[in-house]
Amino acid sequence: MSNRNKNILDKIGALIPGYTGYSNRADKRKSEKKFRDQNALLLEKSEKNIIEFQKILISSNDLNKLNEWEDLRKQLNTMTSLVKYSNYGESSFFSENQIKEDELDKVLLFDEEIVDRIQIIFKASENKLSEELTKILISNCLKEIDRILSNRSDFIKEFK
């Protein structure tokens, strides 16, 4: 968009109550989507790391461990979809319950908690920690992310 168009929009926006807030919310929503897409990508990379470890288990014919890791990989795959496709921090334009900027900031705080757990999962899948510790760490983080996503979704539903 050219500077001329921005200036026109800014001038028009100055005449419309709440325009700036709406613009900021739109920017935050775009950031939120990008943020979640990046985190989903980290989870996908973590899953690929687990798949590489599973190949080692297959070559050593350790089917019991392979099944345990497959369960964890499936949980990770499901969580990737939940993170990627979770509710946006938005409400419809004409809804009686519009999400305000400070409430949208709370949604972003949920996202920050999620990213902390995702980074732990990625580092655990990438590092050569003990196998049992890695499984426990990833499993616990997945449970925490599920809880946070549920709380986040409940919070957003208040404004739909």
Predicted regions and their residues:
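Short acidic DE-rich linear segments
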Residues: S2-N3, I148-K160
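Generic signature of intrinsically disordered, low-complexity segments enriched in small/polar residues
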Residues: Y22-R25, Q38, N97, E113, ...
